[in-house]
């Protein structure tokens, strides 16, 4: 079973940095994945569409144990070919614990037309169908639409009679908190604030407990939307969002210390010219001192020579 969730970003580079850093496998469509940032940027610049949304993201998550990292990446690339054939796409596979998932990053601009990728409801439905088709072709389980929420007959009767259902309380608590956590520990803390807690997490399942009613139920009994794989998919998305937010805040902070390189270059050139001028002045002053010293030395030598001549004459006159 593979599920998909869509998003977008105004910084393709940040999305790629995050996905690439943790990737076990990677591949590219219409680009060399090792240089995806450069390829994406060049295409956006070519069509003059560098502002706004720069890339769209699809997180494709698989049921624990169904695929290897390599198979996971291959399916991600196949999905990219179906949903964005004329776009540059980078596919990165993460293997966090048993939760294998792909970060599929689609450049916002079509290579052929220059049109921007549309992430609307129609496209989202198309991506889900394409994903389900790929899973069926590979013999993987496919979630049925009706299984997103599962009601027992007794619970359905309670709902029909407008009576409160403790299971529905758990569903509501999960829905309100699952997109705000990055791990089960944080998720459990948020759930407790709403009267629900997690009592057990296994390889394939998570068990919830309604604290007031003291009743437990496994996530897959509530519906696929409350199962472990889907919850972990939400963790990955929230973690991705937080790291992008941290990078954005850092960039804004760094911008306050941005160097004016033009002014720096101008000042550096001015300093260089002044340094050269000082050097020339020093050389000229040194030459003047040297010439003066030479003249002084010459005169002194003449004076000494004259004295010697006079002394010799006097000495000659007084010689014994």
Swiss-Prot record:
Domain of life: Bacteria
Species, as recorded: Staphylococcus aureus
Annotated gene: rlx
InterPro entries: Endonuclease_MobA/VirD2
Summary of the function given for this chain in its UniProt record: This protein is probably required for relaxation complex formation and plasmid mobilization by conjugative plasmids.
Keywords: Plasmid
Protein name in UniProt: Protein rlx
Pfam families reported for this sequence: Relaxase
């Amino acid at each position: 079973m593979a599920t998909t969730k869509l998003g977008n970003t105004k910084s393709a580079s940040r999305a790629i940095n995050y996905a690439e850093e943790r990737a076990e496998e990677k591949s590219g469509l219409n680009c060399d994945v090792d240089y995806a940032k450069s390829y994406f940027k060049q295409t956006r610049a070519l069509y003059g569409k560098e502002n706004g949304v720069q890339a769209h993201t699809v997180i494709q998550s698989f049921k624990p144990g169904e695929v290897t990292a390599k198979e996971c990446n291959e399916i991600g690339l196949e999905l990219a070919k179906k949903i964005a054939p004329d776009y540059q796409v980078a596919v990165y596979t993460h293997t966090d614990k048993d939760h294998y998932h792909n970060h599929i990053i689609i450049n916002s601009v079509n290579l052929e037309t220059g049109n921007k990728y549309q992430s609307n409801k129609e496209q989202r439905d198309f991506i889900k169908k394409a994903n389900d088709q790929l899973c069926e072709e590979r013999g993987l389980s496919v979630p049925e639409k009706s299984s997103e929420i599962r009601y027992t007959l007794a619970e359905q009767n309670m709902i029909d009679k407008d009576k409160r259902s403790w299971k529905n309380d758990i569903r509501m608590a999960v829905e309100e908190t699952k997109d705000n956590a990055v791990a089960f520990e944080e998720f459990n803390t948020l759930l407790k604030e709403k009267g629900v807690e997690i009592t057990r997490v296994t390889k394939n399942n998570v068990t919830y407990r309604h604290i007031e009613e003291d009743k437990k139920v496994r996530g897959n009994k509530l519906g696929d939307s409350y199962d472990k794989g889907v919850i972990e998919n939400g963790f990955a998305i929230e973690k991705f969002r937080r790291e992008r937010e941290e990078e954005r805040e850092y960039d804004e902070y760094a911008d306050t210390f941005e160097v004016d390189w033009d002014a720096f270059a101008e000042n550096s050139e001015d300093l260089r010219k002044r340094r050269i001028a000082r050097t020339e002045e020093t050389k000229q002053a040194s030459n003047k001192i040297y010439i003066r010293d030479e003249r002084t030395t010459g005169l002194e030598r003449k004076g000494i020579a004259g004295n010697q001549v006079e002394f010799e004459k006097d000495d000659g006159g007084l010689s014994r």
